[in-house]
């Protein structure tokens, strides 16, 4: 499948979002596993991937971390835009396979880190994060880390479809997109998604 806002990228995604999401979420919760966030191209990731493809200088020739990578959509877009080195990071172990398969489908290489990266600094030039401010405790952990990365010179970009815990007072708006989404997942057919830079 090709996400509607980023048709340049081919992904292995769930095509029946509603049934898969609800059935899998219930079944996996019984055995203590997380929902399959990696099986969908979320609006924040689509907006961020679109921005990177439209503004390749953001990543061209740079070492990039795609944080909370999920399917690898943003990572793949960054590689297509000319990133020198790309690492996708996600704590869901299923993401490693999803990212590998999706990278292969797009003829790019994406490394993978499965450990929690919050607080870590491997000297990335750019950190990309799509749709990560959906819960307050998680956003509260991310903001100091993103600010520390920014203060030492990294470019930190976040794609966000209007989640409640985005710290807009610390951000610079770069672009806004109307991203087609699945109503079963987002309760809408289009999500206004903004790409922000930590200032």
Model-inferred region functions:
Residues 1-199:
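S-adenosylmethionine-dependent methyltransferases
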